[in-house]
Curated annotation (Swiss-Prot):
Acts as a sulfur carrier required for molybdopterin biosynthesis. Component of the molybdopterin synthase complex that catalyzes the conversion of precursor Z into molybdopterin by mediating the incorporation of 2 sulfur atoms into precursor Z to generate a dithiolene group. In the complex, serves as sulfur donor by being thiocarboxylated (-COSH) at its C-terminus by uba4. After interaction with MOCS2B, the sulfur is then transferred to precursor Z to form molybdopterin. Belongs to the MoaD family. MOCS2A subfamily. This is Molybdopterin synthase sulfur carrier subunit. One of its GO terms (cellular component) is molybdopterin synthase complex. SUPFAM superfamilies: MoaD/ThiS. GO terms for biological process: Mo-molybdopterin cofactor biosynthetic process. The modification Glycyl adenylate is found at residue 88.
Length: 88
């Protein structure tokens, strides 16, 4: 898929383990609220086991997948799925 019709998604920690990938390209445009459902269709169980506790960034800003209903992921955008981090 070319960058003119896709966006790049980066997976970190448990998201990377679950998908078996660090990055991949997905078709764009995609409404942000559909992101988790799209990933769930590709990786059954990921929504409940991983995504519900993750943060998501679009470009350099964190976004709320459920609340930001007007946000669209455009071709060439970069999205990151970021699981929670603990420190001690």
């Amino acid at each position: 898929m070319s960058t003119s019709t896709t966006f790049q998604i980066h997976y970190f920690a448990s998201a990377s383990t679950y998908t078996g990938k660090q990055t991949e390209r997905l078709p764009a445009p995609l409404p942000l609220p559909q992101l988790f459902d799209t990933l769930e269709s590709m990786y059954p169980g990921i929504k409940e086991k991983v995504l519900t506790s993750c943060g998501v960034s679009l470009g350099d800003e964190y976004v709320d997948v459920e609340a930001d209903i007007q946000v669209m992921i455009h071709p060439g955008d970069e999205v990151a799925v970021i699981p929670p981090v603990s420190s001690g």
